[in-house]
Amino acid sequence: MAQIPPSLQDLVNRFNQVQAQLQNVLLRKQQYEAELREIEKALTEIEKLPQDAKIYKSVGNFLIPQNRDAALQELRERKELLELHTKTLARQESLLREQIEKLREEINKELSRLKGSVETAKGGG
C-alpha cells in the first residue's frame, strides 16, 4: 500500500483540526442560544408581574430576594451579552465552514493529482 504524502497528511490534519474547532463553536453557540431562550422566557414572565412582586434569584444553593427592576436589568444585560457572543460565534462558524470547504477542495485536488501520477506510473511501467 502506498504511503500518504506528507503534504496530503498535513491537509487532512488541518481539515480535522478545523472540523473540531467548528464542532466546538457550534456547541458553544447552541448553549448560548438555549440560555437566550431561557432569559427571554424569564423576561416575559417578570415583565407581567406587578412592580412590588417578590422575585428570587438563584445563587448557588440559595435563593436571594431581588426587586423586579434589578432582575429585569440583569436579565437584559445578560441577554445583550449572549446576543453579542452568538453573533461572534456565527461569524466564526461561517469562517470555519469556508476553511473546511477550501481544505476539502485542496484535499480533492491532491488526491486527483496522486491518482493521476499512480495511473501514469502503472501505464508507463
From Swiss-Prot:
GO molecular function: protein-folding chaperone binding; unfolded protein binding
Compartments in which it is found: Cytoplasm
Species whose genome carries this gene: Pyrobaculum islandicum (strain DSM 4184 / JCM 9189 / GEO3)
One Gene Ontology cellular component annotation held by this UniProt entry: cytoplasm
Family: Belongs to the prefoldin subunit beta family.
Keywords of this entry: Chaperone, Cytoplasm
Biological role stated in the UniProt entry: Molecular chaperone capable of stabilizing a range of proteins. Seems to fulfill an ATP-independent, HSP70-like function in archaeal de novo protein folding.
Annotated Pfam families: Prefoldin_2 (PF01920)
Subunit description: Heterohexamer of two alpha and four beta subunits.
One annotated GO biological process: protein folding
Keyword Chaperone assigned: yes
UniProt-recorded name of the protein: Prefoldin subunit beta
InterPro entries linked: PFD_beta-like (IPR002777), PfdB (IPR012713), Prefoldin (IPR009053)
Location (main, coarse): cytoplasm
